[in-house]
Amino acid sequence: MSSLSRELVFLILQFLDEEKFKDTVHRLEKESGFFFNMRYFEDSVTAGEWDDVEKYLSGFTKVDDNRYSMKIFFEIRKQKYLEALDKKDHAKAVDILVKELKVFSTFNEELFKEITMLLTLTNFRENEQLSKYGDTKSARGIMLGELKKLIEANPLFRDKLQFPSLKNSRLRTLINQSLNWQHQLCKNPRPNPDIKTLFVDHTCGHPNGAHTPSPTTNHLMGSVPKVGGFPPLGAHGPFQPTPAPLTTSLAGWMPNPSVQHPTVSAGPIGLGAPNSAVSMLKRERPRSPPTNSLSMDYQTADSESVLKRPRPFGISDGVNNLPVNVLPVTYPGQSHAHATYSTDDLPKNVSRILSQGSAIKSMDFHPVQQTMLLVGTNLGDIAIWEVGSREKLVSRSFKVWDLATCTVNLQASLASEYTAAVNRVVWSPDGGLLGVAYSKHIVHIYSYHGGEDLRNHLEIDAHAGNVNDLAFSQPNQQLCVVTCGEDKTIKVWDAVTGNKLHTFEGHEAPVYSVCPHQKENIQFIFSTAVDGKIKAWLYDNMGSRVDYDAPGRSCTSMAYCADGTRLFSCGTSKEGESFIVEWNESEGAVKRTYLGLGKRSVGVVQFDTMKNKFLVAGDEFQVKFWDMDSVDLLSSTAAEGGLPSSPCLRINKEGTLLAVSTTDNGIKILANAEGSRILHSMANRGLDSSRAPPGSVAKGPIVGTFGTPNSSTGMSLSMGERSGPVASVTGLNGDNRSLPDVKPRIADDAEKSKTWKLTEISERSQLRTLRLPDTLLPARVVKLIYTNSGGAILALAENAAHKLWKWQKSERNLLGKANSNVPPQLWQPSSGVLMTNDTREGNKEDVVPCFALSKNDSYVMSASGGKISLFNMMTFKTMTTFMAPPPAATSLAFHPQDNNIIAIGMDDSSIQIYNVRVDEVKSKLKGHQKRVTGLAFSNVLNVLVSSGADSQLCVWSMDGWEKQASKQIQIPSGHSPNPLAHTRVQFHQDQIHVLVVHASQLAIYEAPKLENMKQWIPKESSGSVTDAVYSCDSQSIYAAFDDGSVSILTATTLQLKCRIGPNSYLPSNPSSRVYPATVAAHPSEPNQFAVGLTDGGVHVIEPPGPEGKWGISAPPENGAGPSVSSAPGSDQQPR
């Protein structure tokens, strides 16, 4: 449907609404699919008119369109189901379950089983997730809030939530204007004409009764005397000027079109086809409009530029970005305020410095999470940073996923040098996917599910040689990946399947960049080559529509401003001269050339657009800014120095933060006032859940990974906590605790003190501590862990019972995270049944308790010398038990790619790879001599590391479970081997370095060869190490001792920086010797940890003050290293 036909539908909708044809209005909204009436939808949901709700939705989306749609339908049907259960109408509930909810079982079988189990409960509120379910009215209100977020984030609803700004009775106005115009054409106009029909054109009859031919069959006349007009058909505003005909963005870029296009005369009404040379090239379109075609009023175009439109209020800036805050409007007209900007809005203040470790080649801010930055480097590494908290959430090195399927040329290239640089990184429009273009043939597409959850999605052997650029596009609402490369081609790939859809050939030099875009009904791709040629392509096989030269025949990239109405390019010629220009798309000519770039640039200058107002470029060791409407340089900043000649840079969608590369392989984050406020708030963790960083969002207990991977929305059974961002819900599978949700913080300069001193804490006033409330039988805590959400702590006691403490959201604890200020609740089900492991008679000292928590916090696998038990963390129910001893389980770990597979260390020295789903041991690994006491997976290296009571480390390949390496831990002199010693292992967040915890020492080994990198042997006065763990950012190590003390070490050097004495947190006069038997680190707060005591108590410990830290790391030149033994032949000094 053409744009004007679409607007006619809006006029009809307005007319029907004004005439009170309510049912017809909503039916037309649904059948056209042009406008989603949020108010009507809210009313229908509130009234519980579920059939009407689903019928209305069906005009805009289907259940399986994408994850957002799936979750919308799931929430509605789940509410229907719960209401039927609440009314004790089990027959209806079963009908809803079978006919409406069963469709979701394909995507999350466990969730469907959980929902089915509700039928067995007397009151479904007995289920912990539904314990907060109130009455029907409040439940619908909570659900409605969730649905609105999902609809606003769903790309299928883009531009359908905003009704155009129209004057009242606009259709009547147009009819009156038409009648007045027809009356002016009458040969004998009457002063007061009588209108009896609109079905035929109006004419005033001749005195003799003859009629004038219809004006549609006559040419327009010249000047006609003004005569009295018709009385208006209804209230309307003053006469509207006829809008200028739309000029297409590609028309002027065709100096030699291959098709002859007829001239279209624009009539005064403008309801005909637009005057467009590209109208002949239009392809048949689906009923729904493209996702980035905005519905707005036309304005008269100026003489130099293409037609400009204001953005509807509430749609966030950014080309091809999902509108996450679109506000529903009603039919009456609404004026749009145009934002004003000043130089104070420019992000120029250095607020963060991040250390990446290698030269930055490309960056891109997340389209929804405004403080999340994707980075690619010259060594092939990619990383996702949460810049607010200075946390590196994810890191990946270059690795071909499936070399066997690659071309012979690529295999040969990798054989000579297995490295590749990143040329481009970019997020998909909704942030659910990210793409990486490498300097060797390859494109990687990952699916991102929040926090550290990054999964391989597609590996494409895309081009011969360099893949120079990559972009996402959505032709006809199909998510695609557009690539270009050294082989002079542009290719389009299906982002879901990886199938190649188009190959565009025509450039005579390597293609440097691509810029997909959409104007009106035209979807196209601009491409630029290193010889300065610019071409444009439609998604067909008709060849290039444009052949033009960039200024200076420069190596150029192109970009649109945020609302897609203005086109800019930036490039650097072979001689080093750089150009930033604005293009007049209607003529294919440069409209404006900006001044202030250097004449001898080193490398290609990179640029970006900021909202719809500013341009920014990295040039001459500076960041330079221009107002889009002025050619003169507006402002510049050196960002406190340290920038390369032509730095890489990127601005976030809101224009509040700017990332720029530095010469020392780092990134500086520049901010304006609003950006500084956001960063400061996140640093203090004083955020509500709607602004919480990814990975710290409260994750639903039962979450599914549904639909295609271009979104990260999951489904949950729970009712109580729905305030987190829709796009950050994490999936169920891929359980793995080895990659925590935060990454290293950058130390402040103030911390680099030259006069270093060990921080000794001996009084309660020097820290914050909280002993968790406990009314159950006290028993020694043997295992302790935080839930992945950070809102609860799970302990396993010596008596085989589990205890779970949960922190609730409150005014004192906005995020509901574990802390030492607010006491948690000891969680117990209404049945009073605890999660208790199976046990066996025998010596307690022979038992090695162990447990592992699934990543979504829904399940815990646990053993205490007897069978292994799988518990549901929501209900405390025992899901299953298996593997009765002997042998007994002594260590457990979930497989990182499949939470149905677990590695089980046994007391007979074997390791069993067990598939829970089929109840089968897949492999049995033998390499240890004594019981296995530690297991840790590395996703990066694709290995499993094990440790045992034999003080031996082993590395096993996850592909075939062969042993790759083994190493004996070096026991210092004076320490006799303890046959009951529990050696534990934990991977650093880089997934390469392994922390080895032994009663005699801490050590860092590098996998997979198990090279001993560092060793720390505590002083004898400290006693033996009982447990140790990395902090969540892997910058510190918390080590507990049997003298009651806790030592905090710098992870990179194993140097002691803080020691917490037992008197600062333990009871002053204990009746017996009490010390921490186990320690756990908070998953997102680097300075918080918890200890489980031998008296059954659990303490949460934090430094004093909101910004407190555990001492200062010793500078290398200070020489304050770890205490080591002097035994010959031992690995004594840190290396």
Curated annotation (Swiss-Prot):
Is Ribosomal protein among the key words of this record? Answer: no
What cellular-component terms does GO give this entry?
nucleus
Give the signal sequence positions.
none
Pfam families annotated for this entry?
LisH_TPL, TPR1-like_2nd, WD40, zf_topless
Report domain LisH positions: 4-36
**PROSITE patterns per record:** CTLH, LISH, WD_REPEATS_1, WD_REPEATS_2, WD_REPEATS_REGION
Q: Give the transmembrane ranges.
A: none
Instruction: Report the residue ranges that make up the CTLH domain in this protein.
Output: 34-92
* Compositionally biased intervals (Polar residues): 290-303
Name the segments for region: Disordered.
281-303, 1095-1135
**GO MF term list:** transcription corepressor activity
WD repeat placement: 355-395, 417-456, 462-503, 506-547, 550-593, 597-636, 638-680, 776-815, 843-881, 884-924, 927-966, 1020-1059
Disulfide bridge partners, by residue number:
none
Q: Which UniProt keywords apply?
A: Nucleus, Phosphoprotein, Repeat, Repressor, Transcription, Transcription regulation, WD repeat
Q: What is known of its domains?
A: The N-terminal TOPLESS domain (TPD) (1-209) binds directly to a 12-amino acid LxLxL EAR motif peptide.
Q: Name it.
A: Topless-related protein 4
Q: What is the lineage of its organism?
A: Eukaryota, Viridiplantae, Streptophyta, Embryophyta, Tracheophyta
Q: Which gene encodes it?
A: TPR4
